[in-house]
Swiss-Prot record:
Residues 38-142 form the CBM2 domain. It holds the Pfam family CBM_2. Carbohydrate binding protein that binds chitin and cellulose. Lacks enzymatic activity and does not hydrolyze chitin and cellulose. May interact with mycobacterial biofilms, which are rich in cellulose, and play a role in biofilm formation. Could also act as an adhesin, improving the initial attachment to host cells and aiding M.tuberculosis during the initial stages of infection. Recombinant M.smegmatis harboring Rv1987 shows enhanced cytoadhesion to human lung epithelial cell line A549. When expressed in M.smegmatis as a model mycobacterium, Rv1987 acts as a virulence factor that modulates host immune responses and contributes to host immune evasion. Can attenuate the inflammatory response induced by mycobacteria and alter lung microbiota composition, leading to the dysbiosis of lung microbiota, which in turn facilitates mycobacterial survival in the host. Keywords: Cell membrane, Cell wall, Membrane, Secreted, Signal, Virulence. This is Cellulose/chitin binding protein Rv1987. It comes from Mycobacterium tuberculosis (strain ATCC 25618 / H37Rv). Its main location: secreted. One of its GO terms (molecular function) is cellulose binding. It is found in: Secreted; Secreted, Cell wall; Cell membrane.
Length: 142
């Protein structure tokens, strides 16, 4: 009988260790890495201006090891300026605040990759550059 109790104790200890290791492994796999905007950066620069308009280009770069999905690039334009057309993005407007969102083909930026696009703006009066540019609502553009 004593030999059976030792066998049962060893078996239970081994079973508990195996189950514990399995639970830790499953929980570890359930937490997948997500790219944060802190590991991404954006630039928005005006490349040309003329009396009634301007062209601006943007680049969003994913420096993380996970895909960056559904990015948002937002900025403000002064009164008298507006976005007339975008490429490689869609645009939403609320007053003088604009938000560029990805097109269907560039909504996921692979690790180490980037998405580029631009916009054509119209203006009345003198030109002022976009301001308050943020990536994903919190990280300043360069």
């Amino acid at each position: 009988m004593a030999g059976l109790n030792i066998y049962v104790r060893r078996w239970r200890t081994a079973l508990h260790a195996t189950v514990s290791a399995l639970i830790v492994a499953i929980l570890g796999l359930a937490i997948t890495p997500v790219a944060s905007a802190a590991t991404a950066r954006a630039t928005l620069s005006v490349t040309s201006t003329w009396q009634t308009g301007f062209i601006a280009r943007f680049t969003i770069t994913n420096s993380s090891t996970a895909p960056l999905t559904d990015w948002k690039l937002e900025f403000d334009l002064p009164a008298g300026e507006s976005v007339l057309h975008t490429w490689n993005s869609t645009v939403a407007r609320s007053g003088t605040h604009y938000v560029l969102s990805p097109a269907n083909w560039n909504r996921i930026i692979a690790p180490g990759g980037s998405a580029t696009g631009g916009l054509r703006g119209g203006l009345t009066g003198s030109y002022s550059p976009p301001s308050s540019c943020l990536l994903n609502g919190q990280y300043p553009c360069t």
